[in-house]
Amino acid sequence: MITERQRQILNLIVSLYAKEHTPIGSKSLLDSIQASSATIRNDMKVLEKLGLIQKEHTSSGRVPSVSGYKYFVENVIQLDEFSQNDLFKVMKAFDGDFYRLSDLFKTAAKSLSGLTGLTSFVLNAPQRDQQLVSFEMVMLDSHSVLSVITLGTGEVRTNQFILPKSMTEADLAVFSNLVKERLVGKKVIDIHYTLRTEIPQIVQRYFKVTSEVLQLFESIFDDLFKERLTVAGRKNIFDYATDNLAELYKLFSDDERMLHEIREITNNDEMRAVKFDNDEKYMKNLTIISQKFVIPYRGFGTLTVVGPVEMDYQRTLSVLDLVAKVLTMKLSDYYRYLDGNHYEISK
């Protein structure tokens, strides 16, 4: 445990270092701490022994350590107030009507990246828990078909394909009815199981050439089992990272790996998660911060930013909290529209 004054000193060192990016000495703290310079130095020695601050080789001042940042985030930081300027920018970005879920997520990602200068990610509710609420097939011409899958979150997945030679339009109608009877209403995780157990047996009863029908099932629904990540500011990594840039950019461009990272640190009931110590050596000096947001009556999505360990945590977490609140508000409007017998407009 540290004393209240030591907590204030740590808070100031973290805040000042985030603004000035130079080591902080005891004289810099005198105006804000009601204690002598000697007392402040002694408290700084205690914080250093605890591993919360550390000395820079080129200066007598101190800078926060990874443990210090972690303590600050978990015990000191306050998120009660937003910057009025940040609030104005976020509200302006979300102004207007949204008719596609993807547009809301893109706006959130761009707002996060724009305000923090970091790489940002937006992730929908876990795919496995989403429900298939509707399925339609539309003949585009005598050979081409468009399948339209709608999930409970309002997300729409479309897939255009060539009708297999062995299938007629009547077969296609049977196929569509099978999907509606056996898959619509189920969660994605249950659909995955059904496609591998029940569907092959059912297909044998209705179709002469089963291989092409089973391939069609796989073609249409394979994309359903892949989560989509909305990203903004990938190139921002070059503004705050100096080592292993090629590996980092490769990671940030690999949605599947980033999905794994985000799901790994948010796999609990906490609304916010901060990961300082990463197993990957090229992520050693970076912090991953994730904030869940409410998707009304449908679960939780996730906002994530990745930046340097010495980032301004107070502002970054405040911006995350602000965007999460505004996004949830806009999602409420979106779902009221969607539930009112309207459909998401898909490209």
From Swiss-Prot:
Pfam family membership, one: HrcA_DNA-bdg
Keyword Transcription assigned:
yes
Q: Which cysteines are joined by disulfide bonds?
A: none
Task: Indicate yes or no for the key word Repressor.
Answer: yes
GO molecular function, one example?
A: DNA binding
GO biological processes: negative regulation of DNA-templated transcription
Matching InterPro entries: GAF-like_dom_sf, HrcA, HrcA_C, WH-like_DNA-bd_sf, WH_DNA-bd_sf, WHTH_HrcA_DNA-bd, WHTH_transcript_rep_HrcA_IDD
Q: Give the UniProt family note.
A: Belongs to the HrcA family.
**Alphabetical list of NCBIfam families matching this protein:** hrcA (TIGR00331)
User: What is the documented function of this protein?
Assistant: Negative regulator of class I heat shock genes (grpE-dnaK-dnaJ and groELS operons). Prevents heat-shock induction of these operons.
This chain belongs to which protein, by name?
Heat-inducible transcription repressor HrcA
Q: Which organism is it from?
A: Lactococcus lactis subsp. lactis (strain IL1403) (Streptococcus lactis)
Q: What is the lineage of its organism?
A: Bacteria, Bacillati, Bacillota, Bacilli, Lactobacillales
The gene name on file is: hrcA
